[in-house]
Amino acid sequence: MLPLLQLVPAKLLNSSCSLEKTLQCSCSFHGIPTPSVQWWMGGVPVGVDGMDGSLQVTSTMLGPWANSTISLTEEPEMGMRLLCEGKNQNGTHALSILLMSRKSSLAAQAFVKGLIQGAIYAGIVIALLFLCLLPLIVKHIRKKQAKKAAAIRAKKSSKVRASQELEMSLKPEEPGKPVVATFSESRILEKQDKRAS
């Protein structure tokens, strides 16, 4: 009588991915009975031991071991999922791999480059705008300063006039110098001259 084999569910024991000219991912499963291996790309099953467009699958089974390798000859789309699934009648075990395109790093570099260029262009536009507005700003400042200076001069000249008028009214008349007076002042002066003579 043959000994009964103990049934073992499929279990993933090893997996790896490498990128050279092509992307290669491998999965190794163990189980009794020997698990079957199925690859899924973006939710779609990939054919076993054959070519499927840009995908090539190679599988080998030896005793309780099942090994499978998938090769991608083209770069995957951004965020594409690759699933390696091993199963037998006692269970299923799977590994999901998120594929990232090398182009995605280029997209990030392009984004950063565009961001830097945008900042430089914005700086240039702001500088040109400032240079265009600078004459208007200077003109406005000079007008304000001229108004202030005119107000100060007017204030000073009114003070000077007031002090000169005060001085003139306090100065005694010099003999023989003509006196300029208004009509009412000249009448008063005439009356004073007549009384004196």
From Swiss-Prot:
It is found in: Membrane. Its main location: membrane. Coiled coil: none annotated. Keywords: Membrane, Transmembrane, Transmembrane helix. Residues 162-176 have a biased composition (Basic and acidic residues). The chain crosses the membrane at residues 118-138. It is a single-pass membrane protein. It comes from the Eukaryota. Residues 160-179 are annotated as: Disordered. GO terms for cellular component: membrane. This is SIGLEC family-like protein 1. The gene is SIGLECL1.
